[in-house]
C-alpha cells in the first residue's frame, strides 16, 4: 500500500514558504518528456519534502531497535550483523563466520533476490541488523528488507532536485532508531527505521552549485559524518558532522587551506578557490584515539596544470584528523601524487589493521589510488612502510596536451573506492584493480570556472576496453604473493573470511571466491548485471549469507561489458532451498524473472530529417564530451542520467522539438541556460547525428538557435548508428 502523503506534503511546503503543491506533472528520471514542463516551484524545496512519501509492504511499521553507539563500536565482535559500510570503523571487510569454507563454497546458491525499481549504478553496501537489511539505491532511495527472504518491508523513493555529476549512493547509516542517507542534491535525511517516515531533513553541503553527496552516511557516537563530491566541478572538498538527533551541524573541515592556513602557499594565486580535493568515497576511524582517516581527491581543474603547478595541498592525500574535540585537528598527512593532471584520486577507502612488518606487529593503514599505487603506512605518523604498483603505469607524469597524450591507468582505472581487505591469517592484503589506458586531451589551458559545470580544461577520455586484476600483497615485505586476472574491471572490493576465502567481483557481473593464501579459484557465479558494489556477510538462525547489490555499470561502463539485467539485491547461502525472487513492489515472483521495467513501452525508429551541419556536429561532440558525458555517458548510453540513444531512449517517443526544449530548459542541471544559443544548437546537432537522423537540405542547413515548427516532424527513436554519428 502507499502511505498517504498529501497533507504531510502540503504542511512541509507551507513550512518552507510555499502555499500548495505544484501543479506539474510527475517528475522522474525515466520520464524525459516530463522534464520539459515548466516547473513552477523550487525542485530543491520540493525534494526536502519527499522523505514522507513512503511505500510500505504488509507487516511494516512496527517499532524497531537499532544499533547503539556501543553496538557500532563493537561491530568487529558481532559477525551476525553488518552495521557499518565496511563492517567496522577500521574499514576491513573481514568476517569470522565459518559456515562457508573451501570444502563447500562451490555449493553456494542464490537464496533470494529482490528487484530494485530505482535502476542505475548501484554502489551501496547494505546494513544488516537483527534480521533486517537497509540499503540505499542509485538515486538516493532507501529500502528495508527482510534479510532472510528479501521481502520488501518499506521503501522511500527519492528524486534528487538535481544531479550535478553522478547519481550514485554508497549506503545508509543506522542508529538511534533512524536510517540516515545523504543525497545527490546535498540533503541529509533521517528516516524512521521501522516505517521509513521522514524525521528530519537538513541542508548539508555549504556549496550546492558544485557539490553533492555520494558517500555512505557514517555514524560515529552521536555524529553523522559525510564528505562531499564535486572535485570535477571546482568545489572545495568538505567533510562535515551532524547530530544524529536533529541534524544540527557540529563541525566542518575543508581540504583546501585558505589564506593564512598551513599549506595555502602550495596554491598559486587564487587557484585554491576551486582547488577541489573532494572527499567523496569513504572514511575509516581509529576508535581507540578518535582519529578519522580521509583521502581528499584530485585538484582542479582536473586536466590542466598551468596556474596551479605544485603540491596543491591537501589534494591526493591521506589525512589523519583528530575528531575528539569540537573541531577537527590535522595530525599528519601523506600526499600520494603531486602535479596531478590525470584525475588520479586516492580513491580507495582507507583500511586500518594490525599487521606484521619485520615480524613485529604494527598499527597500519592502507590506501590506493587510480594510478595503480598501493601504499601501506604507519597509522601513528604517516611513515610509508611499503609502496606496491598493482597496474601498468605509463605517461602519468606527462600533462595532457591538445593533441592528446596516452596515460595508463586512466581515471577509471587503478584502485577504486571499495579497495581491498586484510587477511590476518596470512598477513596478506588483497586488492582488486583495473587496467585501462586512455588518451588525455585538453581543450584550453585557461579553463573558466562556471558554477554547475565541469571544471576540467578538457573532456575526461572515453572509456576503453578494460580488464581487472586481483593482487595479493605480503604486508611484511610489500612483495606480490599472487595475482588473478579478471575479464572485466575489478571494482567491487574484497571480503575476507576466517575460513581462508577471499570473495570479490568484476564489473562484468561475475562473483568469485579465491583462496586467500594462494589465489586458487573455488567458485564463480554469473549474476547477469554489473557489480561495482561491495560484498557483505551476515548470519540469521545459524545460516550464513553473502549479499551484494548489482545494477548498471554507469560510470564504469566500458565497451567490452555484457548487457545487464537491471538492479537487484542478490543474497547467497549454502543448501538447496528454492530461490525466493521478489519484484520491486514486494511480491514474490519466479526465480530469475525478467525485469518488469524492461518491457515498458516499445522503442520506435527515428523518422524524418533535421537541419544541422557537420561543423555543428563536431562542435557539439566537443561540448557534449566536456559538459554532458559524465552523466549521460561518452557513448550516450546513460550513466547517472537517462540514455540519449538506444531502446530506452526510443521508448520516450520524442520529436526533435521536444528534445530541444528539454536540453535548452534544463541543461546543465545545476547551471541551466549557461551555454550560448549556438552551443545548445551544436549539442542538439550532435545528438541527432548520433541517433541516425539524416541532415536536411544536403547538410547545409544549420540547426536553429530558436524553436522551429519543422522540428516537430522529426521523431527520435534512439536508433544508434552502427558507425557512430553521420559523416
Where does each model-flagged region fall?
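Flexible coil segments in periplasmic/lumen-exposed cytochrome c-class electron-transfer proteins
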Residues: 597-610, 614, 621, 625-626, ...
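Short coil/turn segments that connect the beta-strands within blades of beta-propeller domains
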Residues: 79-80, 130-131, 176-177, 221-223, ...
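Extracellular/periplasmic ectodomains of large secreted or surface enzymes and adhesion receptors
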Residues: 63-69, 73, 383, 387-412, ...
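Gly/Gly-Pro-rich "capping" loops immediately C-terminal to redox-active cysteine motifs
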Residues: 617, 621, 633-668
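Extracytoplasmic beta-rich repeat domains
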Residues: 114-125, 155-176, 201-216, 233, ...
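Beta-propeller blade signature
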Residues: 237-248, 311-325, 468-474, 565-575
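Blade/loop signatures of beta-propeller domains
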Residues: 61-110, 255-262, 459-460, 466
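Short loop/turn segments that connect beta-strands within beta-propeller blades
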Residues: 146-149, 192-195, 244-246, 323-326, ...
